[in-house]
């Protein structure tokens, strides 16, 4: 692939846990820390006394935060320069007491006030200090240890039974409960078409919006509207002038009235020099993202936070840019603010819909802002990498081997890598675009990757087709194609394959360094779309709470009537797991620790560490 700017013919190239231990005399320590360096050098003490020895284990989250009989140090004097006060508060009870007031409610109220740090527009490029909250927390990193130590570290995260609220004493997260959890509902119908209201409109033969008489027409329109209102989730894109551009359900005729209301509400805030980010009405959440001349709106009755909905809207915006590029989009609306964008986007509606449906069904990739890799032997992946390097051509910018929606290998320039959000767009195009399917897997349409360069297109030249053919031939000769097929057929590992007798039903592990994740098999507990959606909602809750702005402790545990869930965040990884509602807390913690140890052992099979670099 090569890339060219849309306004220029010039070719482009892609391119631990610090602790502060209080001494017996805080005043003396403060004096030594604040006096000038020259004065300290003249001190008769010569140098500050050594810190007290580090305890062998941390008994976190028990009442009082310390072992029985251990005197509690005075933590009232905290150095103002520290990133976090969690260095002296080693229990959720302590933190809750210290933060009681303006911060306590902010930490525990979901989903209105919790905020995650992730953004699709800055994937894999965290700002300096973005992990300060992790590195400054006592519980942000726990070395791999034996199961006996795990009980001390995690054992008292939750000491209450299901349904008993002991939020202040144990740190249990009070998440909303699912409705009708033990029965299958009609969630599968969420993705079915509702019909259209247009001249002779018909959506895949589902509903005709016009009858032979006025009464029949009104009846059909009412039926379409009822189906539209019954949907749990909507995505609507409109222009700043109030013109409908795209909606996941229905058509412009169906949503025109609602678009007018949305545009009026947003404009009223803008007239007051304010910006509307979202609001909640009953159990329905409205999230708004303004991108230049476009407004993107998500309306959801599914358990998701504002930040998660915002990430989804940003991904839809990137999908639009992949078709038009940012300069083209800006030019269209600068010339004519009332531009109808439906025609320029014609043909890409399917990509928008499939991307939106993946969010509705539940997308771990979007939630974690990471990519899933195919588990394969290290030697097999290295063979594929070497084959990519041997067959590459001079104009190659980036190459991918993808199987079953999971990344197998990449070939890339040294010190350059593609944006994970861009790779998600590529995956969506490869596996969902009708043009690619009709072309037997080939597409010559230029595509913009906004995370890399929102101003230009990537082009596929003829010589790259020759490279693809040569690569496939070599992969078949050395047996790599069969190795990939076997890895796909083997499927994701089950929790009991990794930890025999584990109480875990499912887990997701993200490598923060590699911006990649792996997860266990959905079967048998989450084999239906409804149960899978509830699983992702549980992960949504955990992710939002553990990444909340005022959260200090990075180990969270939640018990509801349907499940026990657990999150463990360190500077190295993020682990989210789910078990049954009556799972023993120590067994849950031990299983989580063993999963981390398994990932550490299998890391080069689970993740692409460097890929094929040239």
From Swiss-Prot:
Organism: Emericella nidulans (strain FGSC A4 / ATCC 38163 / CBS 112.46 / NRRL 194 / M139)
Tree of life domain: Eukaryota
GO BP terms: autophagy; protein targeting to vacuole; vesicle-mediated transport
Subcellular localization, as worded in the UniProt entry: Endosome, Multivesicular body membrane; Prevacuolar compartment membrane; Vacuole membrane
InterPro entries according to UniProt: FUZ/MON1/HPS1_longin_1, FUZ/MON1/HPS1_longin_2, FUZ/MON1/HPS1_longin_3, Mon1
Keyword line: Autophagy, Endosome, Membrane, Protein transport, Transport, Vacuole
Region of interest (Disordered), ranges: 1-81
Protein name: Vacuolar fusion protein mon1
Membrane topology: Peripheral membrane protein
Taxon lineage: Eukaryota, Fungi, Dikarya, Ascomycota, Pezizomycotina
Biased composition (Polar residues): 1-11
Record-linked PANTHER family: SAND PROTEIN-RELATED, VACUOLAR FUSION PROTEIN MON1 HOMOLOG
Composition-biased stretches (Pro residues): 46-55
GO CC field: fungal-type vacuole membrane; Mon1-Ccz1 complex; multivesicular body membrane
UniProt family annotation: Belongs to the MON1/SAND family.
Pfam families: Fuz_longin_1, Fuz_longin_2, Fuz_longin_3
Function field: In complex with CCZ1, is required for multiple vacuole delivery pathways including the cytoplasm to vacuole transport (Cvt), autophagy, pexophagy and endocytosis. The MON1-CCZ1 complex acts at the fusion of vesicles with the vacuole, through its regulation of the SNARE complex during the coordinated priming and docking stages of fusion, and particularly at the stage of tethering/docking.
